[in-house]
Regions:
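Structured beta-strand-rich core segments of catalytic domains in phosphoester-bond hydrolases
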Residues: 1-54, 162-165
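Soluble or luminal CAZymes and related metallo-dependent hydrolases
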Residues: 20-22, 74-88
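Active-site metal-binding loops of divalent metal-dependent hydrolases
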Residues: 46, 105-106
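Short aromatic-enriched loop/helix-cap "lid" or pocket-rim segments at secondary-structure transitions
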Residues: 52-56, 113-115
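Metal-dependent phosphoester-hydrolase catalytic domains
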Residues: 84, 91-100, 106-180
């Protein structure tokens, strides 16, 4: 089970988990009180593919039907769970009485249903604040992909957004400055 920790110099209130089906993943929300304003923060770690090293070492000429079928089942099951999780996260965003900042590992690329569902009606801080920089956040494999996001309500303004190239994990952290 994953847990989130939010560190803030501002008071955090109304902390709760967003309910959805998952074996190990979680989304949580809390309200951040900044002077007389309140912003809803939604932190996410959506379903991963749970691929093992051997799953990624496929020689297409010699892959057995069983192995290919097993891999397809893993990909499909994780994708289905993420779609349902995205619906729950979007419902939480829509129900918020405050502007929202939604962050985290969506385990989905920008062209995916999951990203599109959660982003609908929101601003992608990377697209608006990165000034054309590369945005890969997941560093395994030969090509980096962007699966970690900072999104905000349209009433908020992304000012800057950067991917920090530090090696703390298999993901690079994403940092944004958001105005209101």
């Amino acid at each position: 089970m994953f847990h989130w920790f939010v560190f803030s110099r501002y008071p955090l209130i109304n902390k709760q988990t967003i309910s959805y089906e998952s074996q190990n993943n979680i989304s949580s929300q809390c309200d951040v009180v900044i002077k007389k304003d309140t912003i809803r923060l939604i932190v996410n770690h959506l379903e991963s593919f749970r691929l093992m090293k051997e799953d990624l070492q496929l020689d297409t000429l010699s892959v057995s039907h069983f192995k290919q079928s097993t891999l397809n089942q893993k990909l499909h099951a994780a994708s289905q769970l993420r779609q349902e999780q995205a619906k729950a996260v979007k419902a939480a965003i829509n129900q918020s009485p405050h502007p929202v900042v939604a962050v985290g590992d969506f385990n989905s690329i920008p062209l995916s249903y999951v990203y599109g569902k959660i982003r609908w009606g929101m601003r992608d801080c990377f697209l608006e604040g990165s000034f054309g920089k590369l945005g890969n956040t997941y560093k395994k494999g030969p090509l980096g992909i962007r699966i970690d996001y900072i999104l905000c309500s349209r009433t908020l303004t992304p000012i800057t957004c950067e991917v920090d190239r530090v090696s703390y994990s298999d993901h690079f952290p994403v940092c944004a400055t958001i105005g209101w």
